[in-house]
Swiss-Prot record:
Residues 1-45 are annotated as: Disordered. One of its GO terms (molecular function) is structural constituent of ribosome. Belongs to the bacterial ribosomal protein bL34 family. The lineage of its organism: Bacteria, Bacillati, Cyanobacteriota, Cyanophyceae, Synechococcales. Signal peptide: none annotated. It comes from Synechococcus sp. (strain WH7803). The keyword Ribosomal protein applies. The keyword Ribosomal protein applies. InterPro entries: Ribosomal_bL34, Ribosomal_bL34_CS. NCBIfam families: rpmH_bact. GO terms for cellular component: ribonucleoprotein complex; ribosome. This is Large ribosomal subunit protein bL34. Keywords: Ribonucleoprotein, Ribosomal protein.
Length: 45
């Protein structure tokens, strides 16, 4: 039997694309800025 590989882990998602991770780098801050400008309700995961 094969493993379910499509589940997704919330901890991993946060570590890769959470708000605090975005704020660490210049490009991440640019992502947040762009999403704010577009009026996104969710800026990061």
């Amino acid at each position: 039997m094969t493993k379910r590989t499509l589940g997704g882990t919330s901890r991993k998602r946060k570590r890769v694309s959470g708000f605090r991770v975005r704020m660490r780098s210049h490009t991440g801050r640019r992502v947040i800025r762009t999403r704010r400008k577009r009026g996104r309700s969710r800026l990061a995961v």
